[in-house]
Amino acid sequence: GVDEEVKQDTGGVYGNANQSDANILAVLDMRNQELTLVSISRDAMCTLDVLDSTGAHVGTATAQLALAYSYGDGAERSCELTSAAVSRLFYDLPIPAYGSIYMQGIRQLVDSVGGVTVTPDASFSGFTAGQPVTLTGQRTENYIRYRADSTEGNNQRMQRQKQVVLALVNKMLAQVKE
């Protein structure tokens, strides 16, 4: 997920894009037909490809994963750069496909399936621990973006992001089967 409502116009200049917010690696076990989601902190330090303002590769740098997306064009090239950084982080794990979605898009996607139901692990900002809630619209974004002022705030946020993605995938699969 991209840390912005909608794609910004970079004016064709590389290095002007938003940062990634949620970085989730989907691992498909085709033999056992299982999906595992691995959340990767946007603050994870990794080797990033650095591009100049025209998009030419000028080297690498060690920096936060969130910055990989920002070095690109805010679209496919940003996804390629983030995918390459995640691959390196996992010892050159092949990543055959990738995608990104802006915050407005995740709200629209969740709304398109009639919302998703999740159970918060902790109480915060209008959500109660252990009380299932069906997320739609702005509440979806509030749920996945809230960051507590604690050392575990980022980890809790990543868990909620993963929880929403898994609930969304399960709901879409259930609707396809109907």
Located regions from the model:
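Non-catalytic, solvent-exposed segments at the cell envelope interface
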Residues: G1-E178
